[in-house]
Amino acid sequence: MNPQRKKRLLLIVGLLVGVGVAVGFALSALQQNINLFYTPTQIANGEAPLDTRIRAGGMVEKGSVQRSADSLDVRFVVTDFNKSVPITYRGILPDLFREGQGIVALGKLNADGVVVADEVLAKHDEKYMPPEVTKALKESGQAAAGGETKP
């Protein structure tokens, strides 16, 4: 093999290794930022991973919101009308958060089956509902409060 061909081969191999490492880092970073959506039924059935950031969504059960008197801690229950999951959150809830409305909570599921949320998203208006929540409610055979939903 002549020296010029050997040099080219080493350059190509070096570039391929560099691209491979870059793709590996990119995939690793993307995997850490993925938040999969789980319904209350999936969470109650043990399909959601523990201590991994997930999105849990459904309708806030009426009468389930409990606010702490001396802190910003809130505990409420989310349902897809098949099963329910308790969620705890520390912070100020969105203005549109209320019982009987659709929400999506981002957080981690603990060993007690409680989603410890660090972010709560409420629906935008009376007709809008997050697509994941709409799909989960349709699969459970229930309609959202207030009639039809628009994804």
Curated annotation (Swiss-Prot):
Record bears the keyword Lipid biosynthesis: no
Coiled coil: none
Domain of life of the source: Bacteria
Residue ranges, Cytoplasmic side: 1-8
Subcellular location: Cell inner membrane
Binding site for heme: 124, 128
Intervals, Periplasmic compartment: 30-151
Transmembrane feature ranges: 9-29
Main location: membrane
UniProt keyword list: Cell inner membrane, Cell membrane, Cytochrome c-type biogenesis, Heme, Iron, Membrane, Metal-binding, Signal-anchor, Transmembrane, Transmembrane helix
SUPFAM superfamilies listed in its UniProt record: Heme chaperone CcmE
GO biological process terms, semicolon-separated: cytochrome complex assembly
Cited function: Heme chaperone required for the biogenesis of c-type cytochromes. Transiently binds heme delivered by CcmC and transfers the heme to apo-cytochromes in a process facilitated by CcmF and CcmH.
Family membership: Belongs to the CcmE/CycJ family.
The name this protein goes by in its record: Cytochrome c-type biogenesis protein CcmE
